[in-house]
């Protein structure tokens, strides 16, 4: 990858959710694609690049898009179609294995998981847990509905990309397209609908405490919003970095902090 790889100084949050049957996992992946911009909007945490305000809440994916085989994947009719796609790439020397497929969501080639890769890394532990809980509840919900032969319309990647761009640009402060209603809707409202959609799974999974934190994100803003607030106040990128460091320590126990101090010394 040459300079592309050397310049790829970005950090993402990848969440794995187990689905033992890979045929089922492909169909769950098809359904989950629609929700990726909603999840990304909650997770945006990369408004700066090389010390400059990019004007985007999430710039990380724009950096990563320089790589091949990124973004929201196309839908696949079956595991066989997906396997044929991967085998063709290996046969023609594009990749040596399917781990070189870096989509926003993918069927992991070695683990029996769906891996959601769209999110920016979070600076607060509670934000990380909340987003992971939302993803877990979504995959569980879609898996359960699929077993009941309930599915949703599969939208084209190019339509989903419109929402992905909006999430990158505005985070939770913008609007996403509600394709079912064919109109723009406040992102926060769609996320509230999302939370209601998975509410029964949250209760079953016992992740209510983690999920409740999403309301805090919606109220206080994303990691990107907090970084930009520091920037607006100080016009000092070092102050932004100090803020990120301070947030990273929030939620860590005294034992964990002591262990970090020991390693550092």
Q: Residue locations for each model-derived region?
A:
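Metal-dependent DNA replication initiation modules
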Residues: 1-13, 17-20, 26-73, 77
């Amino acid at each position: 990858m040459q300079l592309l790889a050397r310049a790829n100084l970005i950090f993402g949050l990848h969440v794995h959710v187990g689905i033992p049957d890979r045929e089922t996992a492909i169909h769950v992946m098809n359904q989950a694609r629609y929700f990726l911009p909603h999840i990304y909007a909650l997770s945006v945490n990369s408004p700066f690049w090389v010390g400059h305000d990019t004007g985007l809440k999430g710039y990380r994916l724009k950096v990563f898009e320089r790589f091949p085989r990124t973004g929201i994947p196309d839908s696949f009719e079956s595991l066989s179609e997906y396997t044929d796609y991967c085998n063709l790439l290996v046969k023609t020397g594009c990749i040596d294995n399917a781990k070189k497929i870096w989509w926003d969501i993918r069927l992991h080639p070695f683990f029996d998981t769906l891996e959601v890769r769209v999110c920016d890394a979070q600076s607060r532990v509670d934000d990380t847990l909340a987003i992971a809980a939302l993803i877990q509840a979504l995959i569980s919900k879609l898996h359960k509905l699929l077993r009941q032969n309930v599915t949703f319309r599969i939208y084209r990647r190019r339509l989903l990309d419109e929402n992905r761009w909006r999430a990158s640009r505005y985070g939770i402060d913008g609007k996403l397209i509600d394709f079912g209603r064919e109109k723009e809707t406040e992102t926060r409202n769609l996320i509230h609908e999302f939370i209601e959609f998975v509410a029964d799974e949250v209760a079953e999974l016992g992740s209510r405490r983690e999920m409740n934190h999403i309301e805090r994100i919606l109220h206080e803003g994303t990691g990107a919003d907090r970084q930009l607030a520091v920037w607006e106040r100080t016009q000092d990128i070092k102050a932004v970095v100090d803020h990120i460091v301070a947030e990273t320590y929030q939620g860590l126990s005294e034992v964990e902090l002591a262990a970090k101090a020991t390693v550092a010394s």
